[in-house]
């Protein structure tokens, strides 16, 4: 990643997660949380036809225990580095749920 410093961010209606996606993995998993706060995720789906983005939303919804409608990729739809908005979940709750699912 570049010199950007991503962290879990709190907002009025929820939080935002910086995510780095590796498609075509053997399974869906959270690999690690990088020093800059970016969540490294492996997905089994290919990046074609928006499949990886859909898989990411489905996977994060499962991990965070929220409906898919509460998640949105707000930046990075065509790249590996993404910013995902999580509505109605505070930063601390999101952080704890992600750490509980580290590979």
Question: Where in the sequence are the language-model features?
Answer:
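The alpha-helix within a helix-turn-helix
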Residues: 61
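Contiguous, often N-terminal, cationic amphipathic patches that form binding interfaces
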Residues: 1-58, 72-77, 83-103
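Short acidic capping loops at alpha-helix termini that bridge into adjacent secondary structure
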Residues: 68-70
